[in-house]
Amino acid sequence: MMNNKVSFTNSNNPTISLSAVIYFPPKFDETRQYQAIVLSHPGGGVKEQTAGTYAKKLAEKGFVTIAYDASYQGESGGEPRQLENPYIRTEDISAVIDYLTTLSYVDNTRIGAMGICAGAGYTANAAIQDRRIKAIGTVSAVNIGSIFRNGWENNVKSIDALPYVEAGSNARTSDISSGEYAIMPLAPMKESDAPNEELRQAWEYYHTPRAQYPTAPGYATLRSLNQIITYDAYHMAEVYLTQPTQIVAGSQAGSKWMSDDLYDRASSQDKRYHIVEGANHMDLYDGKAYVAEAISVLAPFFEETL
């Protein structure tokens, strides 16, 4: 497949260069204008993993797609490394769209966005704020604020996450005094750390040959908790998320409640929900049959709505 690795200045922060790969459809003609889709990776992931998988497969269906590394992560610039600030992650999507609008072969009126896991939540938030996004797709959606407040299966009270806010605050002080940034796992760092099979697969995805990648260590800066805990990826979705929305989630995903929540809260007149029977959260990252089913829903959705 024809692709082009690019690096461009983040329009929100000119000191940061964003690294991305653009995938082109079959028989690409640079004199034409194409529908384009921005792909956002999970928390702790990079463009070479599941975001790249979906970018390639959607490009095969006729779209120009771009998978990128978030600021402070992967091959993109920024210090401290592995900062997971949800507000910056959301703004990165708009920065990538800024870049797309400079490409002659992209139709600026037909740009969509899609994300996996936390990248899906960031995609929803970006669409709430950025009207250039004409349609969104989500796969195994995670509202990162909700999951840190309420747990993987939504069985923890928000007030019980207050110690995390304190931990993030204390980390900022220790970071400055020690000169080293404290970190926290975004997926289990060891197999024995996983509380269930689904999260054991998250460890397997990020830390074994299944999908591990050198620029995806699977952790974030501990100071990120200050922004994560109070963040709501779906804030004002009831009012401003009016774009067509296609949600895809596995029937066995512990995270499915966050896809349910997005569907309930989105004000879109055209919102669709496809459940992949038998799939858990991680299956939709790289399970061949499950990903194929997701693409069979997402590709026609974007073709229709962009």
Swiss-Prot record:
A Pfam entry, by short name: Peptidase_S15
Gene Ontology terms for molecular function: hydrolase activity
Tree of life domain: Bacteria
Biological processes annotated in GO: cell division
UniProt xrefs under InterPro entries: AB_hydrolase_fold, Polyketide_trans_af380, Xaa-Pro-like_dom
Protein name: Uncharacterized protein YcjY
